[in-house]
């Protein structure tokens, strides 16, 4: 225990003196002092740019240092010109960043500049036993694993479970009374089918479930989780049918509202059919932007504005989440951070509802959804003189020290074994498994800004086919 306390104190003292590097001169000025302090043990420097990770990385550094009898010095660096700072420190400092966290879309630039190197993966963790294919593709460049997957972000469907449960009960009651099937929408029919199956099971077991609670009787009707799930729209056709038939509570302003100004929450409409860089995002020949399926998806997207009337210049992700907390909307598109916001609202007493997370709806019954994802990874610096130890720490961080990563940092581990007991995060993981990744190609670094502009214009009624062709021509030219 005494050794652990001394190690923590030592790390804190170092971090207080030099962790945040406001400029290169300040960092270089600390080099001699730090080198003297840690000359007794092999030492590696670990860079990151997100302050939310500070306490967690410091704890991981202490744990790994004690296990291996080495020193890991975390270095928080401004994310402004992060790669350039890494490059300068690698070329001109005696304290080279041995490993660092980087978004997958910057891996080509890092690899070509020598900052990223092929990982050794001595622990044998970079496989589908430990990470989904999406994560492995994200850290692959030109058929080489050049990083370890660490944490990810993607989007999923967030719904007000309280509202949906009440609506499902109404649908089931109509079926029970024999007067609601004719006008029932697709989602309602699914809920009714689930009800019939559940009630049949209930009859076969004396009308009780495994816990002894009554499933259905003449006087009461209990809605099961399966029936609620059956009522969640699987595509936008079902979403529109739901909206047409939904008898909304007084404070509900919209059935569906999301941030239509941000490509991260729009991409799922076209993600399954738009190709930029191939599976690993590094193939200049794999580009297919303007095809019939993408055009159909964008037409669906454009038509939704006629139904949901979302003003792109006045909506934001934060405003949508607040509307959801206030009970003004039934469904929205959200990223993993929403779980923390809802938990906080619950604790403050401002969110009196239950909620659920589901897979994103397809654009139509025939067209499939595919969300966008970003994978932050741990890179071993090609300039490092301690690459073996840096690889060990990267493997430790991504495959051993992931417990409570989300609770302490808000970041969701890409490791399949993480968050096993969190149902909401497991749904996000399922979405991540099927998601597309940001491409790594330097020439397409502005693609997402251009695609976001395209979505904005399509939402406002401009010709989708023409805009797609313009974007396709522009990206093709950039890659030549």
Where are these regions (language model features)?
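Extracytoplasmic/periplasmic solute-binding protein
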Residues: 146-150, 155, 183-201, 206-286
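Extracytoplasmic/periplasmic substrate-recognition and gating elements
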Residues: 45, 306, 346-410
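Short, polar/charged alpha-helical segment
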Residues: 50-72
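Short, solvent-exposed loop/beta-turn-alpha elements that line the ligand-binding surface or hinge
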Residues: 120-131, 229-231, 276-298, 346-350, ...
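Ligand-binding clamshell of periplasmic/extracellular solute-binding protein-like
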Residues: 46-50, 72-136, 149-159, 230-240, ...
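Conserved C-terminal helix/tail region of periplasmic/extracytoplasmic solute-binding proteins
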Residues: 22, 403-404, 423, 430-480
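Hinge/lid segment of periplasmic solute-binding proteins
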Residues: 102-156, 167, 182-186, 190-193, ...
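Glycine-centered hinge/linker elements that transmit conformational signals in sensory
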Residues: 240-246, 283-315
